[in-house]
């Protein structure tokens, strides 16, 4: 998965945190690297390249909260939110619909 500690996903999550994929939890395996991480998907059927992976949020009946992640890292959820790096686009949702995507790396800031 192309996200790592340079994006604010802490090394403390190595071998401890889960992500959501197809409505199921998948454990982070190995070390969270600078710009990638790996997860164990052997229990999830038909995983495809480019499937959506949820690091924090809801997928089906499963949910991972920032508070859950903060507990794993020994911090508070506010700190995790502040650590999200500028390489991560911000997606604004209103009424369940995406209303804006802000990519801080784009020159037009659009």
Regions picked out by a protein language model, each given a short descriptive name:
Residues 1-110:
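Active-site anion/phosphate-binding pocket segments in diverse small-molecule metabolic enzymes
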